[in-house]
Amino acid sequence: MLEVGSKKFFEAYAKISLIDIYNSELKNAELLECPDIQDCTNSIGVEVTAIPNKQRFMAAKIAKKCFNKELDLDDINAIVSEDFKSFNGVIFEWEGRKYISSSKGYEDFSDKIDSIAEIILKKVDKFNNNYKRFNENDLYIFCHNANFTVNDITIIIGRIDLNVFPYNKVFFNCIDKIYLFDLKQVNQINISLEKLEKYKQCAINYSDI
């Protein structure tokens, strides 16, 4: 089993979600290095990364400590108030399942937009130095926030020189939606809560490593 929030968890989650929303043939891809997801049969490589987020790591710890232990929301909130005082996210229940988000309400995205743009530029440098090349080279970014809009993604893309950009596609994972930039336009793909739970559980139990 993979620990939620670990590097391999993110890689497995990215692969599982891409199989569902983009290319089912990626089921044969392997989790390797440089890039993280490699499908040699179809010549597709996907590098996976995530923006740093202390609240996200705290949410993962809360989920590990409190979820799947027959605790109701009041019990969980009491534990959070006692042991995770700086947590600023939200915990909720829907159709008998409990969910946790590391953020809530309106946020100033300027810092987050800067962070994502910087990460993309760093990945471009690394790609040009020592990454294996495929016919299709993609980048998958966990943004850890459901409030990003198409406009936010467009702003991020505007900070990139596409004339020397090595990736064919960029997937921006924004929790309940994934934005796909194909060098021409940004498409929004909505992900249901049921699928979010499925992706998570499949990633936790991913064993083809």
Please place each PLM-identified region on the residue numbering.
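Conserved catalytic cores of phosphodiester-cleaving nucleases, focusing on short active-site segments
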Residues: I37, I44-A50
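Metal-dependent nuclease catalytic core centered on acidic motifs
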Residues: M1-E30, T49-I209
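Short glycine/proline-enriched coil/turn segments at helix->beta-strand junctions
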Residues: Y22-E25, C40-I44
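Alpha-helix C-terminal capping segments
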Residues: L18-I19, I37-D39
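Aromatic-lined ligand-binding clefts that engage carbohydrates, nucleic acids, or primary amines
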Residues: E33
